[in-house]
From Swiss-Prot:
It is an enzyme of class 2 (transferase). PANTHER family: BIFUNCTIONAL PROTEIN HLDE (PTHR46969:SF1). Catalyzes the ADP transfer from ATP to D-glycero-beta-D-manno-heptose 1-phosphate, yielding ADP-D-glycero-beta-D-manno-heptose. Keywords: Acetylation, ATP-binding, Carbohydrate metabolism, Kinase, Multifunctional enzyme, Nucleotide-binding, Nucleotidyltransferase, Transferase. ATP binds at N195, L196, S197, E198. One of its GO terms (molecular function) is phosphotransferase activity, alcohol group as acceptor. Pfam families: CTP_transf_like, PfkB. The active site is at D264. CDD domains: RfaE_like. This is Bifunctional protein HldE. It comes from the Bacteria. Its EC number is 2.7.1.167, 2.7.7.70. Pathway: Nucleotide-sugar biosynthesis; ADP-L-glycero-beta-D-manno-heptose biosynthesis; ADP-L-glycero-beta-D-manno-heptose from D-glycero-beta-D-manno-heptose 7-phosphate: step 1/4; Nucleotide-sugar biosynthesis; ADP-L-glycero-beta-D-manno-heptose biosynthesis; ADP-L-glycero-beta-D-manno-heptose from D-glycero-beta-D-manno-heptose 7-phosphate: step 3/4.
Length: 477
């Protein structure tokens, strides 16, 4: 069956809800503090990611849809960081600034793939005047195909009933990711998307699928909902609608590494698909496929159109092969969570020969996963001259990715991969030739993180330069 993705580029979605900033501090720890019996973390990497309703908006934008985000923030660096991060991924922010409150921020400190502590910076926004939120919704209703209300019980949706009524009056479907057990607040919504535990907290424990359907249909009637989608983890999803047979969809997840933010992905894909003009059943099909992709990633993540297309066509992304830098970071984090040793090397790899193959096979034997970082065409030209590369970057990466020894291939634009290596921090950095370890780009960063640096020998008689010279001589002859 041929599956066509929705026309996401024509979809407009507004997300209103509790926005927050997720901060991550990473670093090694090798000693206990003399001040208290706690580990000392030497922070060497800091990451900031939009969370809560902001992650829903990112999921919508990652599909190519037009995403607008409305929420409450403080007037602080966290709000500015959120705005910048979201603007970078084409989310249009229209925050209501509340000078008396901080932007909700969650700071996590991690070392050796373990979260040591989480610090929350927040004050509930209950009691804040909701009128500015209502005004922003009203202004957008004529230009959107769906309204998402993302509830994390932080106060932005204190007036959720008024928001539902505004959208329904304009004929715009309202999708809500609920929080808590008071579903009366969501009366009249188009679709609620509770997970199974949230659903059972309202209707009671369900022993069978039939009980889920029976109690779900009663909930729809009690709260005048148009539909209910219960996400059931490894058992997939169940869509319930009045007058229609239940639609049960099995999970499409190949491997589950992290369910963080999966609900955000589901409601984001649902909204974008509906706003593109597809049916609710089709929206659930695509949302289920997207959930299967995102739980295979570490941390709050989004799904690209290519990943979604692969998933719905039965070619779910394996998490290996040619990757972007951001995709690689997620793949490496997942590998470390599985206890795998990550090896990294780099080079031009212009005309792949036996020496390259032997070298990469030997490098792979030193760990569980091998990353190959490849010079871009411009970088290669600067290093090797105007006649190089012979093979363009895309072809070089595809050939490398086809080798059994290579797990991940990524490119870099600079003359050296030092910045890239500093961002990945492999357990083992490998380089071929007659280098000294301290001369290798990225060695200082790897050592500082507790990793190793090793020089491997190349096979004698194998050289790209010699191959090119031989080809040129043969042409002359």
């Amino acid at each position: 069956m041929k599956v066509t993705l929705p026309e996401f580029e024509r979809a407009g979605v507004m997300v209103v809800g509790d926005v927050m900033l997720d901060r991550y501090w990473y670093g090694p720890t090798s000693r206990i503090s003399p001040e208290a019996p706690v580990p000392v973390v030497k922070v060497n990497t800091i990451e900031e990611r939009p969370g809560g309703a902001a992650n829903v908006a990112m999921n919508i934008a990652s599909l190519g849809a037009n995403a607008r985000l409305v929420g409450l923030t403080g007037i602080d660096d966290a709000a500015r960081a959120l705005s910048k991060s979201l603007a970078d991924v084409n989310v249009k922010c229209d925050f209501v600034s509340v000078p008396t409150h901080p932007t909700i921020t969650k700071l996590r400190v991690l070392s050796r793939n373990q979260q040591l502590i989480r610090l929350d910076f927040e004050e509930g926004f209950e009691g804040v005047d909701p009128q500015p939120l209502h005004e922003r919704i009203n202004q957008a209703l004529s230009s959107i195909g769906a309204l998402v209300l993302s509830d994390y019980a932080k106060g932005a949706l204190a007036s959720v009933q008024q928001m539902i009524q505004l959208a329904r009056k304009a004929g715009v479907p309202v999708l809500i990711d609920p929080k808590g057990t008071d579903f009366e607040r969501y009366r009249g919504a188009t679709l609620l998307t509770p997970n199974l535990s949230e659903f059972e907290a309202v209707v009671g424990k369900c022993k069978t699928e039939e009980e889920i359907v029976e109690r779900g249909m009663k909930l729809i009637a009690d709260y005048e909902l148009s539909a209910l989608l219960v996400t059931r983890s490894e058992q997939g999803m169940s869509l319930l609608q009045p007058g229609k047979a239940p639609l049960h969809m099995p999970t499409q997840a190949q491997e589950v590494y992290d369910v963080t933010g999966a609900g955000d992905t589901v409601i984001g894909v649902l909204a974008a698909t509906l706003a593109a003009g597809n049916s609710l059943e089709e929206a659930c099909f695509f949302a289920n496929a997207a959930a299967g992709v995102v739980v295979g990633k570490l941390g709050t993540s989004t799904v690209s159109p290519i990943e979604l297309e692969n998933a719905v066509r039965g070619r779910a992304d394996t998490g290996f092969g040619v990757m972007t830098e951001e995709e690689l970071k997620l793949a490496v984090a997942a590998a470390r969570k599985r206890g795998e040793k990550v090896v990294m090397t780099n080079g031009v790899f212009d005309i792949l020969h036996a020496g390259h193959v032997f070298y990469l096979a030997n490098a792979r034997k030193l760990g569980d996963r091998l990353i190959v970082a490849v010079n871009s065409d411009a970088s290669t030209k600067r290093l090797k001259g105007d006649s190089r590369p012979v093979n363009p970057l895309e072809q070089r990466m595809i050939v490398l990715g086809a080798l059994e020894a290579v797990d991940w291939v990524v490119s870099f634009e600079e003359d050296t991969p030092q910045r890239l290596i500093a961002g990945i921090l492999p357990d083992l950095l490998v380089k071929g030739g007659d280098y000294k370890p301290e001369e290798i780009a990225g060695s200082k960063e790897v050592w500082a993180n507790g990793g190793e640096v090793l020089v491997l020998n190349f096979e004698d008689g194998c050289s790209t330069t010699n191959i090119i010279k031989k080809i040129q001589q043969d042409k002359k002859g």
